[in-house]
Structure formats: C-alpha cells, structure tokens
Amino acid sequence: MWPDGICRVTNTRYTKTIQYQDINYQLSQNEDKTAIFEAWCDFLNYFDSSVQFQLSFVNLSASQETFARSISIPPCGDEFDGIRAEYAGMLQNQLARGNNGLIKTKYLTFGIEADNLRAAKPRLERIETDLLNNFKRLGVVAAPLNGFERLHVMHDILRMDEQEPFRFSWDWLAPSGLSTKDFIAPSSFEFKTGRQFRMGKKLGAVSFVQILAPELNDRMLADFLDMESSVLVNLHVQSVDQVNAIKTVKRKITDLDKSKIEEQKKAVRAGYDMDIIPSDLATYGAEAKKLLQDLQSRNERMFLLTFLILNTADTPRQLDNNIFQTSSIAQKYNCALTRLDFQQEEGLMSSLPLGLNQIEIQRGLTTSSVAIFVPFTTQELFQNGSEALYYGINALSNNLIMVDRKLLKNPNGLILGTPGSGKSFSAKREITNAFLICSKDDIIICDPEGEYTPLVERLHGQVIKLSPTGKGYDGSPCYINPMDLNLDYSDDDNPLSLKSDFILSLCELIVGGKDGLAPVEKTIIDRCVRIVYRDYLNDPKPENMPLLEDLYNALRAQDEKEAQYIATALEIYVTGSLNVFNHHTNVDVNSRIVCYDIKELGKQLKKIGMLVVQDQVWNRVTINRAAHKTTRYYLDEFHLLLKEEQTASYSVEIWKRYRKWGGIPTGITQNVKDLLSSREVENIFENSDFIYMLNQAAGDRQILAKQLNISPHQLSYVTHSGEGEGLLFYGNTILPFIDHFPKDTELYRVMTTKPQEVASA
C-alpha cells in the first residue's frame, strides 16, 4: 500500500478505491428509477476488459458509545440540566428504535495489470478521474481513498471485534521494520473447518450467490443491505472483450444449431415430425440469439460476475441464524446462497475492498443484468458534529436524522404544514435543541399568536409583549424603539444608508397607497433621517438615540407640502392612540433567547410591529456578527409578512443578507401560496436549503411538487400524514421523517400548542 491509495495486490496488479455515498433510489418515482438504472448501465459499460472492478458494501456494527457520544448532551451544572437529561433520554430512545448500530459504507475498487507502479499510476489516476465524473453525472457524492483511509477500512473489517481506533503513521514503518499488514491484521486467524473461520473473537463465513432466476429484481441487493447484522456484500465484475463475447455466443449458437440438426435427423429416421425437438434446445437457441442481438445492437456488454456475501457473528448459533436470514433473501428472488467449502480464506480475502478475486465462481451476465444490482437505496442524514440537531427518524430506515444547518451553503429554512400538523412544535423542538447544544447561538422569535411564551420562560429568556397600551405581561411599560441604530448596522462605513431604507419601508407601510411613496417623498424622508441621527452619530449615547417623534418634527420643519402629508400620516403613531413605538427601548433585547409577542398589537399595528421586529433582529445580527455568534431567527405565521409589499420585500432582503452575517432565519407558515405570490418572494424558496415539510393541503401539494420537483411517491409522505410526519429537504437530500415526541415530559408540556393540552399543563 502506498500513501496515495494505490495498492499492489499481486506482482502485476495495482488497485485504487473510491468511496461513494447513497442516493434516494427506492424513494424515486419510476421515471427517475429508470433514468438512474440507465445511467448505471452507462457507468458499467465504461469498464473494458483490462479493468476489473469490485463493488463493496460494508455494514459493520459500531459501538453504542460511538453513537451515544454523537447524541449526548452533557450537563452544564445550571438550571437547565433537567431538560438536558430529558432531551438526551428522548434521543436515546429514538436511537434504540432504529439500526444506527450499523455503519454502512459503499466502495468501488478498480484494478489493472501493469509491470510496475510507474506504469500503473497514470492510468489508475485517469480511470479514477473518469469514474468520479461518472458518479457526478449520477448525482452521487464520491471521493477517492488515500492509503491511510484504505488501511483504516480493512482494519475495521479485520478487527471488527475490537472496535478500537486505527493507529497508524507512514513514519512508523521504517524504524519498526513492520509492514502495513501488521497494523490491520487481527490477533489471530483460524481456518480449521472448511465452512467457517475465526478472526480474532469473531466468527465468519463466506457464501456465494448462485443467480438462478430468469429475471432479477432491483430490490435484491437492497434487502441484503437492510439486514440488521454485520455483513459484507461484494460483487467482483470483469468485463469481457466485446469481440470475444460475440465470438463465444456465435460459437454457442453454432453448437446449438448443430445439435438441432442432429435431433431433426433422428426424428426423420424415427419417422416423426422433424419440428419436434427437445424444448430445452429450442429455448437455449432462442435465448442465445437474443443475447447476440443485445450484444450487437443494444449497447450491451458481457460481464463475468462473482457475488460474495460475508456474514459474521459472535457465536456459531448467531452465525447460522445470520446465514439463514441471508439465504432466505436469496431464495425470495429465486437464487441460492451456497457456502464456500474449503475456500473460506480465499473468500475472506476476496471480501476485502482490495480488488482481488480469488474465487473462480463466475456467472456471465449482460450490462442490464449486472446493473439490476443497483447500489443505491436511501440516503441517511446523521452528522456527528457537535452542533448537529435532531429532526426525527428516517421513515425508510428508522435511523436518527441529525444535521447541522450551519454546514449548508444557505442555512435559511422554511417549516411548512397545515394547521395541526406540528409546525410550531417542530420549531420549538429545534429552538430547544439549539439552546441546549449550541451554547453560543442567540435565538429570536417573532410570535404573532403568543404561542412561544411558556417555552421561552422555561428557558429563562425574555418575552417582549408589544401591545397598543405599551404594557407587558406584568403590567409594566414595554417599549421598542424602531429608530434604534447599531453602528455595525451595515457592511460599509455608513450604517445610516441601510437604516434609511428601513425607515422608508416603515413610512411606506404607514402612508400606504397603491403606488407607495413618490420619489419626492422618499427624498424628504431620507433628508430628515440624516438630520435626526446627526447628534447620535456624533456622540453615540443611548439618550441621543432619536425617536419617531424626532422624525415627525423634522418632517414638520420641512417646507414641502409632501413633508406635511407624511408627518400627518405619522401623527397617530407619535402623539395619537397608536404611539406605542414612540418610546426609547426599555426592555432587555440582549437576552440569549428573545421572543417578540405581537399578538395584541391589533390589525393597525401588527404589520408595523412585524417590520419593527425585523429591524430589531437585524440590529442583533449585526452585533452578533462582530462577536462571531450565530443568530437563529424564527418567524411564525410567516405569510402575514408576505401579504404586504413592504414587509415582503424586507423579508426577501433578510433571506438574501442574513447568511453572510451569521444569521439563520426560519419561516413558519401554512400558506404556501403566499410564498409564491411574486417572483421576488419566490426567491425565499430558492434561498432556502432547509425545508421541513409536514402535511400539506391538496392545492399546496401541487404547488410544492412543481416548485421543488417532488415525485408523486415522495409527495405521499405529506398527503394526509400524521402529526410530526413529512419530508425533510436538506441541501440536495430529500428524506421522509417521523418525529413523535414523548408526551410524558416537561418539554412536551411547554412546547405543545393544542388547546386542551395547554389548559391541562
């Protein structure tokens, strides 16, 4: 083995390995399945007779400690340790439901004959580049393994009983006099009996699959890989030279024709009809001619396939059970599983991803017959990062879904679903998880329905209740100043330009009118904004922060009649009955978790309130950016923001701008149609790499199917689905999920929005 990943397996054979990820084949609609199948056929046809390749599917048991570490939430010695333990317990229970105890990996190993490494290397690298491009066309993520990584894979296979970390360095070889084999070999091998072997403390047995079925099924390989025990499935494939393949088939047809003539002669001599010949002869003749036609005119090649399965276990009885289960799957598809007799050592070596086949049991198959063993089933989303959050379990495999939105190119997100499908609950679960795990992240919620207060109070956050009377939950004054300005408000040196844009949006919302503000009115407002912020920018003290009243007075001081018109429109919000936003901010907007409850603002103030909250959040995002902190922003009833042009355009700006500033906005809505109300608002969809889609109404399903290219089969997961069930879109991955949160917990009681449960809590 060399550091670049090239391995010499015989004196003249050199191999390399590529690891590739899964794609959603089983979840795809039939047209997509056909497209993947045809693309896989083209992939196989790339290999000529000089390149032998091996498809390896390695399902190994991982220690529960490995997964437990991934989902653990260590106590911090504060008042939240109780809910940390509760949430961690829920994750442990969900982990036990799935088969996350298995780590599933897929490899393609290819090899060529060459006189030496210098001759082999350029050709192997050229083949590797071509294969990576072919994987890319399939939409499959793939990467070549270097020497260390290949040794690591074989270490995990050969020492699966130890589950110890792989320790190796190329620098250790020369001083120690050891070879790479010494670092991957198990403590012992034992091949005493002809039908099984012992490898360290593990028992194993290699069998080969006899393909007897006249027709093969694309589920067969998937069923082998769905077994809940450690198993290694290997397909060694050797392409046959096309000219030789055609010659061989023609020779076989000639032999069959010769036999047919002999049978006809016998018939004539015996005095019966010469068309009556053995049925097998007629069948073989027709099949051979069809095979010749496929090879000559249907882009089919001939391959020799060796199909090996390695089962392992801790005890002989368990091994027999695993082999019996494997054999049952083979029989289900009219194939036979046969144990290798006195070839177990060769079988084990052939089961390692080395590209070396020592088992001379081969079956000739055409391209489409080999391709029916489609190496794709369903994707998994289980990230080991310290900030990966829980989003349910994979409905196809029952495995945990743990992902970190920060790893996406665009972490902006949407939570979509009909009333009662679990939208707000899903948002609260993510908020809680982020609060408990992502210790540096700040969380801000825009809450138009007053649903988040119990959770925020349990997390000791700040609930800012905005109402026309200006009174908070405890009756004390509660004010937010829309004129608040942070000096880091903009990318450039002039934060006032961006603040002026917000105030223009605010005035446009207040003044109203079908056509919005006229150019003259915009100019006047911009002029006044610069006047009222002059003192604060010269001396940025809190008491110098302007109020809406200062803008009103500046407008009154202007000569233009348009200024008087705007000032009059502002009057009700300054000296009138809706003057709740004409005060200095007097609440703590810097708490780690802040909820803006705007339920009681009323129809006149709610739109303005939502816009003011947006601006307050932007202030917080700019402060956090300087402190290298992430700001998670949740906008419930998001459709309310999209109904007005001003708040909609400001929301679109959030979706475009937040990523660069360390913000992660999440819109929560039941009205998908509002998300597509204009081309501008449609950008929110295009700038969201995370979509948590729960049950959808019929009309919305069709819109989403078209917008997100969802297949009918995928759509079934959001059709009349239960609470907490649906589809997760994470980057290019689509997974069906189920999230049933345990109801007998404190967290459930503070997160539920069901009236009867809220009342009882």
Model-derived regions: residue spans:
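Hydrophobic anchor at the beta1->P-loop junction of P-loop NTPases
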Residues: I415
